[in-house]
From Swiss-Prot:
Highest classification ranks of the organism: Bacteria, Pseudomonadati, Pseudomonadota, Gammaproteobacteria, Pasteurellales
Function: Catalyzes the conversion of dethiobiotin (DTB) to biotin by the insertion of a sulfur atom into dethiobiotin via a radical-based mechanism.
Protein's name according to its UniProt entry: Biotin synthase
Domain Radical SAM core: 50-277
Enzyme kind, highest EC tier: transferase
Family as reported in the entry's similarity comment: Belongs to the radical SAM superfamily. Biotin synthase family.
Keyword terms of this UniProt record: 2Fe-2S, 4Fe-4S, Biotin biosynthesis, Iron, Iron-sulfur, Metal-binding, S-adenosyl-L-methionine, Transferase
């Protein structure tokens, strides 16, 4: 039985279509090179294929999270060596944001390890958002479940994007997370949309899900109304001490397939090649860009896990003739050969 998600309205988005799990699964079954080719054509119809949006992600409150997400080293339930830290001071965050901008990042993402902010936290968070926004950067926050009115506070402070991943398919979700439900995720996404914020929503591949469950994950994202402006696709980073430390290895072609299917089903969304790049070969990353990925996290750390080194990223982008996205090169008409 398929789960139908109708998140924001009772009428289909005029520029979207309903994607059944079966239909998405059929895309996954497409011969690999044909699937990548189809995704590349879709990508070129909506984006400049040479431009890659660079984001930097910083943990502004680390560790001690009460949730039991099976992939997360910041959970207080697991012994992973992550030390709990309080919410950082505004000045420290601004300094990191300045460095990120100087290195080419156009978006600065901030994450806090907790179930969700308390009303007493919102004042400081909005102060942080305003300070980063004043640097001329796009701002993105991943602060967990939001109470009523909080999304409006963040919007007023200048937050551009709110990240809140669904993580995996509705069917696989309970195998990964038990302390909050899939519907809790959707509730916060609804509050974010209602406040007028852009949505960044994706998940993690390689958490022992099967292909049908991966198809259910992509279908759930593609059927959000409207579709997320940004879709981060993470490859599981296995961390000792977490329940998923011994998850089965995912074949690299399956990850590339997921990128391609995300691009085809969400043609106007940024598809971000997110966590896990540190362990990816240059060839695998190149295939992901060919399949429609057009955003990466740039910097040596993602919250508390490692990321590809900046020098390595610069070298790879030069090899592939890619360039950081700017307002000028964001949309260039490239007619695909047919």
């Amino acid at each position: 039985m398929e789960t139908t998600l109708q998140l924001y309205s009772n009428t289909p988005h005029p520029q979207a279509q309903y994607w059944s799990v079966c239909k998405v699964e059929a895309l996954f079954e497409t011969p690999f090179l044909e699937l990548v080719h189809r995704a590349a054509i879709v990508h070129r119809e909506h984006f400049n294929p040479q431009a890659v949006q660079l984001s930097t992600l910083m943990s502004i409150k680390t560790g001690g999270c009460p949730e039991d997400c099976g992939y997360c080293p910041q959970s207080a339930r697991y012994r992973t060596g992550v030390q709990k830290q309080a919410l950082l001071e505004v000045e420290d965050i601004v300094e990191k944001a300045k460095i990120a901008k100087s290195r080419g990042a156009s978006r600065f993402c901030m994450g806090a390890a907790w179930r969700g902010p308390k009303p007493k936290d919102i004042g400081k968070i909005t102060e942080i958002v305003k300070a980063v926004k004043d640097l001329g950067l796009e701002t993105c926050g991943t602060f967990g479940l939001l109470e009523d009115g909080m999304a409006e506070n963040l919007k007023e402070a200048g937050l551009d994007y709110y990240n809140h991943n669904i993580d995996t398919s509705p069917e696989h979700y309970k195998k990964v997370i038990g302390t909050r439900g899939f519907e809790d995720r959707l509730s916060t996404l609804g509050k974010v949309r209602k406040a007028g914020l852009k949505v960044c929503c994706g998940g993690i591949i390689g958490m022992n899900e099967n292909r049908k469950e991966r198809a259910g994950f992509i279908a759930s994202l593609a059927n959000l109304d409207p579709q997320p402006e940004s879709v981060p696709i993470n490859q599981l980073v296995k961390v000792d001490g977490t329940p998923l430390a011994d998850a089965e290895e995912l074949d690299w072609t399956e990850f590339v397939r997921t990128i391609a299917v995300a691009r085809i089903t969400m043609p106007k969304s940024y598809v971000r090649l997110s966590a896990g790049r540190q362990g990816m070969s240059e060839e695998m990353q190149a295939m992901c860009f060919m399949a429609g990925a057009n955003s990466i996290f740039y910097g040596d750390k993602l919250l508390v896990t490692g990321n590809a080194e900046e020098d390595r990223d610069q070298l790879l982008m030069a090899k592939l003739d890619l360039e950081p996205e700017t307002a000028e090169n964001r949309r260039v008409s490239v007619q695909p050969e047919r």
